[in-house]
Amino acid sequence: MRLESVAKFHSPKSPMMSDSPRATASDSLSGTDVMAAMGMAQSQAGFGMAAFCGKHELSQNDKQKAINYLMQFAHKVSGKYRGVAKLEGNTKAKVLQVLATFAYADYCRSAATPGARCRDCHGTGRAVDIAKTEQWGRVVEKECGRCKGVGYSRMPASAAYRAVTMLIPNLTQPTWSRTVKPLYDALVVQCHKEESIADNILSTVTR
């Protein structure tokens, strides 16, 4: 079973899981099986499970748990980022909370997010390659140039920058870009990494 099946399981129309075989191909995972598998995955990949469940609106509690996990990670690696490492006590903690909150919000975006769907590909991540279509006489697609194939626009990092300047008024855009934004980007990437870890663990325990 993959993580995407967890979201389907929580849908009222999906009381049984049939996409992942157990002993035989005809077996289905019952609700008890799914809950047990999720419990095992959460014990081994709490961050990734919380991130995914919060992303899919399965639990408001998981959203906050994911942000807390992300803040812990941010504290752990903040020494590598000069713009954050030099901050003191309470200010540093608040900045890391802002970065974690905005980074998680960026991770949660999808083509279904209101206003986020790519205008060029309409959420498909694909666009017509006009030159090759004319050359070959048939429709040839390519990765959408606007959204880079994901189907939606990312949350502007400028939103996080504006929030951070409420705590560090003298933080200039160039300094943000060089010394703080790299941490923000790393937090977004970490969310995706943790989701991937959770997905692999869930797949393993339901194999």
Residue ranges and their predicted role:
Residues 3-6, 136, 150, 168:
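Intrinsically disordered, low-complexity regions
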Residues 148-207:
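Long, charge-rich boundary regions
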Residues 118-121, 144-147:
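Short cysteine-rich clusters marking metal-coordination/redox-active sites
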Residues 101-117, 123-125, 134-139:
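Short, flexible, mixed-charge glycine/proline-rich loop motifs
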Residues 139-145, 153:
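Transmembrane alpha-helical hairpins and terminal membrane-anchor modules
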Residues 1-108:
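N-terminal alpha-helical interaction blocks
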Residues 132-134, 160:
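N-terminal low-complexity, intrinsically disordered patches enriched in charged
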